[in-house]
Every structure is written in structure tokens, then in C-alpha cells.
């Protein structure tokens, strides 16, 4: 087919924007062929552009040459069409299509490009392997649902910028090539040609630079920034990801959280047209772990964890009694109306909690005949009634117990809570439940490393009332830290920062760094603290995760234009890839690659 020149052509309208009000106008449209139907005397083409679809009718009576050319048009050809907008005949209106009240009768047709047959249909809900979608990402992104995701991403970023600009924040870029501080996740390293044997790293976050900007008197900073972590991937992780990074000087925690609530409400209104009520509830970390078994609680449903440690401490059931005696705890969930669960279903749940360290899952079924359970014989009537009262048990309920150290109980029942909610269809996908989780521990002890690790990062300030515990019992110190959670997913996290050199040096010492190590890694920050550092704090929001929740997707790969696979590769451009020996030589790098295991020989018959 002859390809027409684009010279002089100008689009007048987007096809998906045409309505009955445009009837009688002559328009020039441009887009892709979604579908072509030949009805003998007429040819119908659904023309697609970013705005949607419009039906173009080719009739030899209106445009003979255009009709002839349309006979050779196929799916995904790129067309320009000039034609007349006409109301559709009665009975042919398509109420499911925004432009469904009109057709465009083509006078002229230009074929701007042809196309091979795509490896999958360019339409929503297409059932195709994700690796194929990622390899042909330029086709996948033509699908309306994928374009909607990126449009919402754009609107979200714009809403963020508009809100922060109105509130006195400056958008300031920080370096992409920076210094290695190997305390957190594994870093991507960039060799320096000019400084042989030395490396930059790609930043995991702009944390230190934004604090330096506060020292520099910028007062209110933000940027929408790309960050990098060389870690194993999950559905909500990528080696490169985007976050909204914010820092403020002279702010109290309440002021910062209130401003962020206003920003989130603004984002959801501008990008989705949804009204979000504020303020968000605030839940202390200990309460979140105690009631929901998670520091990212999904508040769209109940199924709260009930502490029975005191209630069962004297029962004859050795599993419970020994755990309580050893300083552990016993907690349970009342799964309302689930007494009918089969033994297999309970066994499946038992296997589920075992992944989180639970050694078993005790249960009581509240049947018509009364409580039924392998453990009931170890309880006196008084003890059993006390447990049932504590759990609010009624006929038809299923009571599920885990006894272990607190971390295992929380993780196991936290999983069980989510799994039961999923099985019982308790999760309202339309509901938005925001919460701030606050008062995190500042550090946690690692018995293997025999040292403390920062829960958030080493620059998080301890609560003023806990400062005296820093020297004696750092594990009991609470942090001025906060995470914003939406429907069980962490949207963002931050803290008020340490802004005094003496406290920052003490924090490094608690984390096991010598004074020399601390200065080698963070000397520039410590030196900056000598020159009048203001009190400051900030937060970072994961933009990819936020868009994933806003669009109802299951993976952030659906809201990133060109994501990596779960094996950290780019299927479309085939990256990462080998480089030439010359490139390696320029960087003074020699490869020491792992030896590939030999392929097993087929067994001899």
C-alpha cells in the first residue's frame, strides 16, 4: 500500500471528543485503526486516539477515492481522515461510547503508516502473558486502561506540584551520582572513569541532600525524584522507582501531618474526583501491632486480634501455659460465622501461619451443640467461658489462636486477618481508609549482628521524653516517625530529624559505628550541623504505589510506562546487556563472573 505524506495536514479535533453538538461540522481526525468492518457498500472504521474511539464511515457516494483506499486498511494502520460529522440513524446510537451519537463520513483519507499484525489485541481486558506485554510495551500502552493509568499519574504529579507550590515549597533537584553509604539496601554502583577504582552510587533517596538543603536555609523543599535499590523484586517494588520527597524547616509533627493530609485530599480530588475526609486517624505503632498484627493495618474490616495472655495463663493446655510462662503471648481472632469451616480449610490456614513462624493454629468451633475443639478438654468450664466472653463468641463463630513470642503472633495473625477478610469478601474495594501510624520504635536489636538497627533510618529523631533512654535502653526509645497507610499499604513515611551533632553522633554509636566510621560516611552532614541547623522534618511518598492504589491495579508495573520485570530486566530494550571489552578497559574493570553449572546430560536408556 502507498503511504501518504504528512505534509500540510492538521488535526482539527480528537475523535473521542466528538459529540452530537459537532453535527454538521467538517473535521480532520488522526489516529489508529482499532477495527475495520466491510459491509459491502460501506466500510466502517473505529478510529482510536488518546481521547477514545469514533466511528468513521467510508461511502463511495461521499468520498470515492477514500472508500477505495479504505479497502486496504488494516488494524493499527495510522490514518488521517477529513469528513463530515453526522448524527447516527435512529436505532444505531451506541450508548456505551461517548462519541456514540455521531459518525464521521470520510471525504478524504491519508494512510500515514501501515502496521504488522500485533501479537495481541489492542483492547482492555486482553488475556496475554505479561512478558509479551512488556516486550511490546509500545503496543500495550496503546490500550485505553494503560493510558488512563498514565493520565492519572500525570494528574497526580501535577496536583502535587500545584499544592506544594501554593504552600511555599521549592522544587530543587539533587544529584543522581552520589556517595555510597552501605547501611541500607544494596546500591547500584557507577564506576568513575576519571577516578579509577572509585564509584558513585545511584541514590536510594535524597535523604541527606534534603537535610543539607534545610541547613542551607531553603526551608521548604520538594522534588518528584527517581530512586534506586538493587534488591529482590515484588509486586510493589522496582529497581528504579519514583517518590515525592518533601522536607520542611521549623515544623512540628502535627503541622506537617495536617499539611500532608490536605495535600493527599487535594490529589484525590484533582486526579480522581474523589472527596477525602480529614483528619486521618492516628494509631500508635504498639496499638497497630497489637490490634491488627501489622504496622500497615487495613482498616476496611474488623477481625481484630484479641489478647488472651492473662485469660489463659493458668490453663492446663501446655502450649498456652508454657508460652505465657516464657514471656510470650496468646492472641486470637473471632472469625464470625465461620464455624462451618472444614478441617481442610483450617489446615490450609495453619499452613499459612506456619510461614510466619507459628508452630500451630488452635481453634474452637462454636457449633449448635456448643464449643467444639481438640483443646477444649484442657479448660475448666470457667476458663473456657472466660475465653468465649473475651472473644464475644456466638454460635456459628470460629475462634483461631496463636501462641508464641509477640513478633510471631503479630505476623501470623496479621496474615490470618487478611486471608480471612479475602475469603469472606469483607474488603470493600471502593473504600479508602487512611491512617497515620506513629510512635515507632527508634531502633531494634539484631541478635545475630549483636547491634541495633534503625527502624527507619539513622537520621530519625527520638521523642523528647525518651531522650534519657538513649544511653541506657535504646530499644525502648520511640521515634518521631510516622507512616501514612491506605488500605493496608504504606503510601509514605517520614520523621522529624535529628538536627544536633551530639545526638546524631550518639545515634551512630548506638548503631555500632565508631566515630571514625561515622565521620568517613557522614562527615559532611556532621560538619553541616556545626553551622546552625534548624529543626526540620519531612516525608517521602511512593508515587508508583500511590498510583497503583488509585487505579485499582495489582502491580506497580501497570502504572509505570517502562517497568522492569520481576527479574530486574527490561524486555523491550533487552537490558541489562553486556558491554564491550573496550568499555570495561576504560573503567579499569575486569569481570569475575560466576561459573555456570553444566547442563545435565540426558539419562541413558
UniProtKB/Swiss-Prot annotation:
Q: Which Gene3D superfamilies match?
A: Bira Bifunctional Protein, Domain 2 (3.30.930.10), GAD-like domain (3.30.1360.30), Nucleic acid-binding proteins (2.40.50.140)
Q: Please verify whether the record's keywords include ATP-binding.
A: yes
Quick one: which residues bind L-aspartate?
A: 183, 229, 456, 497
- EC number per UniProt: 6.1.1.23
Q: What is this protein called?
A: Aspartate--tRNA(Asp/Asn) ligase
Q: Which UniProt keywords apply?
A: Aminoacyl-tRNA synthetase, ATP-binding, Cytoplasm, Ligase, Nucleotide-binding, Protein biosynthesis
Which NCBIfam families does the protein's record reference?
A: aspS_bact, PRK00476.1
Amino acid at each position: 500500500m502507498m503511504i501518504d505524506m504528512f505534509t500540510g495536514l492538521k488535526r482539527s479535533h480528537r475523535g473521542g471528543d466528538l459529540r452530537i453538538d459537532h453535527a454538521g461540522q467538517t473535521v480532520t481526525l488522526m489516529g489508529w485503526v482499532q477495527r475495520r468492518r466491510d459491509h459491502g457498500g460501506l466500510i466502517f472504521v473505529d478510529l482510536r486516539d488518546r481521547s477514545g474511539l469514533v466511528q468513521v464511515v467510508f461511502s463511495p457516494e461521499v468520498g470515492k477515492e477514500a472508500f477505495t483506499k479504505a479497502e486496504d486498511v488494516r488494524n493499527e494502520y495510522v490514518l488521517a481522515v477529513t469528513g463530515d460529522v453526522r448524527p447516527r440513524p435512529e436505532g444505531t446510537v451506541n450508548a456505551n461510547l461517548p462519541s456514540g451519537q455521531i459518525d464521521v463520513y470520510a471525504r478524504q483519507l491519508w494512510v500515514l503508516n501501515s502496521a504488522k499484525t500485533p501479537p495481541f489485541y489492542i483492547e482492555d481486558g486482553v488475556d496475554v502473558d505479561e512478558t509479551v506485554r512488556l516486550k511490546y510495551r509500545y503496543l500495550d500502552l496503546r490500550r485505553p486502561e494503560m493510558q488512563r493509568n498514565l493520565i492519572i499519574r500525570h494528574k497526580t504529579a501535577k496536583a502535587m506540584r500545584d499544592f506544594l507550590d501554593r504552600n511555599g515549597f521549592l522544587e530543587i533537584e539533587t544529584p543522581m551520582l552520589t556517595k555510597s553509604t552501605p547501611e541500607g539496601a544494596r546500591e547500584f554502583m557507577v564506576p568513575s572513569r576519571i577516578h579509577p577504582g572509585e564509584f558513585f552510587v545511584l541514590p536510594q533517596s535524597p535523604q541527606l541532600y534534603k537535610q543539607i538543603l534545610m541547613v542551607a536555609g531553603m526551608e521548604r523543599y520538594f522534588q518528584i525524584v527517581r530512586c534506586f535499590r538493587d534488591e529482590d523484586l515484588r509486586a510493589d517494588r522496582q529497581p528504579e522507582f519514583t517518590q515525592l520527597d518533601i522536607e520542611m524547616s521549623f515544623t512540628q509533627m502535627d503541622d506537617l501531618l495536617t499539611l500532608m493530609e490536605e495535600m493527599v485530599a487535594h490529589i484525590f480530588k484533582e486526579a480522581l474526583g474523589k472527596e477525602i475526609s480529614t483528619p486521618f486517624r492516628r494509631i500508635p505503632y504498639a496499638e497497630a501491632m497489637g490490634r491488627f498484627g501489622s504496622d500497615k493495618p487495613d482498616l476496611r474490616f474488623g477481625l481484630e486480634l484479641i489478647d488472651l495472655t492473662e485469660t489463659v495463663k493458668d490453663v492446663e493446655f501446655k502450649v498456652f501455659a508454657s508460652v505465657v510462662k516464657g514471656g510470650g503471648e496468646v492472641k486470637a481472632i473471632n472469625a464470625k460465622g465461620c464455624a462451618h469451616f472444614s478441617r481442610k480449610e483450617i489446615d490450609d490456614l495453619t499452613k499459612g501461619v506456619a510461614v510466619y513462624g507459628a508452630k500451630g493454629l488452635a481453634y474452637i468451633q462454636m457449633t449448635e451443640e456448643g464449643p467444639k475443639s481438640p483443646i477444649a478438654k484442657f479448660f475448666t468450664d470457667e476458663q473456657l467461658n472466660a475465653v468465649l466472653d473475651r472473644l464475644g463468641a456466638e454460635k456459628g463463630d470460629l475462634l483461631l489462636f496463636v501462641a508464641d513470642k509477640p513478633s510471631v503472633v503479630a505476623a501470623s495473625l496479621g496474615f490470618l486477618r487478611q486471608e480471612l477478610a479475602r475469603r469472606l469478601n469483607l474488603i470493600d474495594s471502593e473504600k479508602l481508609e487512611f491512617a497515620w501510624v506513629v510512635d515507632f520504635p527508634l531502633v531494634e536489636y539484631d541478635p545475630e549482628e549483636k547491634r541495633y538497627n534503625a527502624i527507619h533510618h539513622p537520621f530519625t529523631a527520638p521523642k523528647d521524653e525518651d531522650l534519657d533512654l538513649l544511653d541506657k535502653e535504646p530499644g525502648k526509645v520511640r521515634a518521631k516517625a510516622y507512616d501514612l497507610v491506605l488500605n493496608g499499604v504504606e503510601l509514605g513515611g517520614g520523621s522529624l530529624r535529628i538536627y544536633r551533632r551530639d545526638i546524631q553522633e550518639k545515634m551512630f554509636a548506638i548503631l555500632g559505628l565508631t566515630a571514625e566510621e561515622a565521620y568517613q560516611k557522614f562527615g559532611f552532614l556532621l560538619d553541616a550541623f556545626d553551622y546552625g541547623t534548624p529543626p526540620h522534618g519531612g516525608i517521602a511518598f511512593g508515587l508508583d504505589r500511590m498510583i497503583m492504589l488509585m487505579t485499582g491495579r495489582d502491580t506497580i508495573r501497570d502504572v509505570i510506562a517502562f517497568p522492569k520485570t520481576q527479574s530486574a530486566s527490561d524486555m523491550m530494550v533487552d537490558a541489562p546487556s553486556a558491554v564491550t571489552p573496550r568499555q570495561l578497559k576504560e573503567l579499569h574493570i575486569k569481570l569475575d563472573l560466576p561459573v555456570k553449572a553444566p547442563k545435565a546430560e540426558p539419562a541413558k536408556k
